[in-house]
């Protein structure tokens, strides 16, 4: 399938609330993530990610929405608190082998959830977060959510894939190209047999068997650059 056609099919799938698969790069995490639009999230998406992917279910948030929500990078929180808790300074992730900085932010639950971990609770939290970003109600974030929680937020870099080539930014690039709210859901695909990340070949096989779009990060970034030009 030609890249242009494949990307267009992926964007249509995202608008329909379907999952797409994205492999980042051989010189990065070497992982394939399941990605779906946060505003389309349902408990069944959480179940599929939990059972078929098995990694950490996270919520990439665009730089613009992160700024409006006021969510910091976790590393900034740790740095601020290291004066009182010196161990946090020692735990700084300055030696990540595949990147310069972690995208991790805070964890949240919606206040209507119970424990926050069930498929229903996580879908509620994610969907409501996408909703306040879509409707430009960012100021209600603190009233509607509590932290810590069971949904991990990832803060995308300013400029997204033009500045950083992580799944966080690639997820947001897909949302932008699809005309969707700049909040996504992603989960790394793991391999039960090896205990490692699922190989690209097996991820592509999964995509074929489940009629899902699979793309590489290079294809996504190339398409995004054309989209922005």
From Swiss-Prot:
Function field: Catalyzes the conversion of D-ribulose 5-phosphate to formate and 3,4-dihydroxy-2-butanone 4-phosphate.
Pathway(s) this gene product operates in, as recorded in its UniProt entry: Cofactor biosynthesis; riboflavin biosynthesis; 2-hydroxy-3-oxobutyl phosphate from D-ribulose 5-phosphate: step 1/1
**Looking at the UniProt record for this protein, which Gene Ontology cellular component terms does it annotate, in alphabetical order?**
cytosol
Protein name (record):
3,4-dihydroxy-2-butanone 4-phosphate synthase
Q: Which organism was this protein described from?
A: Methanothermobacter thermautotrophicus (strain ATCC 29096 / DSM 1053 / JCM 10044 / NBRC 100330 / Delta H)
Specify whether Transmembrane is a keyword of the entry.
no
Q: Which GO terms describe its molecular function?
A: 3,4-dihydroxy-2-butanone-4-phosphate synthase activity; magnesium ion binding; manganese ion binding
Give the protein family: Belongs to the DHBP synthase family.
- Extract the PANTHER family matched here: 3,4-DIHYDROXY-2-BUTANONE 4-PHOSPHATE SYNTHASE, GTP CYCLOHYDROLASE II-RELATED
Concerning NCBIfam families, the annotation shows: ribB (TIGR00506)
Using the chain's own numbering, where are the disulfide bonds?
none
The Enzyme Commission number assigned here is 4.1.99.12
Q: Which UniProt keywords apply?
A: Lyase, Magnesium, Manganese, Metal-binding, Riboflavin biosynthesis
Quick check: keyword Lyase in the entry?
Answer: yes
